[in-house]
Amino acid sequence: MAGEQTTTEYISHHLTNWTYGYLPGEGWKVAYTAEEASAMGFKAIHLDSMLWSIGLGIVFCAIFWMVARKVTSGVPGKLQAAVEMIIEFVDNNVRDSYSGTSKLIAPLALTIFVWIFLMNLMDLLPVDFVPGLAGQIGAMMGHDPHHVFFKIVPTTDPNITLGMSFSVFILILFYSIKEKGLGGFVGELTLHPFSAKNPIVQIILIPINFILEFVTLIAKPISLGLRLFGNMYAGELIFILIALMPFWIQWALSVPWAIFHILIITLQAFVFMMLTIVYMSLASSTEH
């Protein structure tokens, strides 16, 4: 594919999602070009990101369900041993970092870690393999393969990463209000970090405290989502740039980068999980 397109077209093609949305003047449709996808703005959905994220979520549930059905107290198989190792790893991190009493946190942390790891893992597939297959299928259906977009790494889509982080944010708000009460939650936003014994001075400090605490609060999901997106997007872009090089250079660069990228894939899933645990622990704590 790289040989049939200019460098700019090739990169743009690999970074454009399969998008369905509302295009001004044409109505609801699948974007035919990157420009159309961009023009759809917020009135659009990335079909490939949704397909892969939901599909990998189903794979995660299916694997763990299958292991749970066949679990044995004797010598475990390789798959059962791997699942037990992951569960124990997540459980230990929850015990070490979470000070609350909710039983939801461990399953939540496990889901986040494995799901994000599987989505990140898609970045190790050859850059042109799945998009190339999608292009061939599109060609058989009468479409120009250069206008068939199909990204396979959901975590390179900020809609996915921010969607997950803001879902965590909703849980943070829920547990903050549940554990501290509405008054305690509002008090955290308005009475800290600055306080005064003089009531008039304290009233003056309330809007200042609110601005500072609100920025701190809203920065949590934004930084959580953008950190994952930025690292995975950069990794994907490097793979794309390597694919543009001569064949013999591709192997020399892609193999070391893929090996190093395994660390990034695992680390980013771990960081997202740990920050979620820490944020949930802070939300459940009655101490500011």
Swiss-Prot record:
It holds the Pfam family ATP-synt_A. One of its GO terms (molecular function) is proton-transporting ATP synthase activity, rotational mechanism. GO terms for cellular component: plasma membrane; proton-transporting ATP synthase complex. Its main location: membrane. It is a multi-pass membrane protein. It is found in: Cell inner membrane. The chain crosses the membrane at residues 47-67, 104-124, 157-177, 199-219, 237-257, 258-278. GO terms for biological process: proton motive force-driven plasma membrane ATP synthesis. Keywords: ATP synthesis, Cell inner membrane, Cell membrane, CF(0), Hydrogen ion transport, Ion transport, Membrane, Transmembrane, Transmembrane helix, Transport. The keyword Nucleotidyltransferase does not apply. Belongs to the ATPase A chain family. NCBIfam families: ATP_synt_6_or_A (TIGR01131), PRK05815.1-1 (NF004477). F-type ATPases have 2 components, CF(1) - the catalytic core - and CF(0) - the membrane proton channel. CF(1) has five subunits: alpha(3), beta(3), gamma(1), delta(1), epsilon(1). CF(0) has three main subunits: a(1), b(2) and c(9-12). The alpha and beta chains form an alternating ring which encloses part of the gamma chain. CF(1) is attached to CF(0) by a central stalk formed by the gamma and epsilon chains, while a peripheral stalk is formed by the delta and b chains. Key component of the proton channel; it plays a direct role in the translocation of protons across the membrane. This is ATP synthase subunit a.
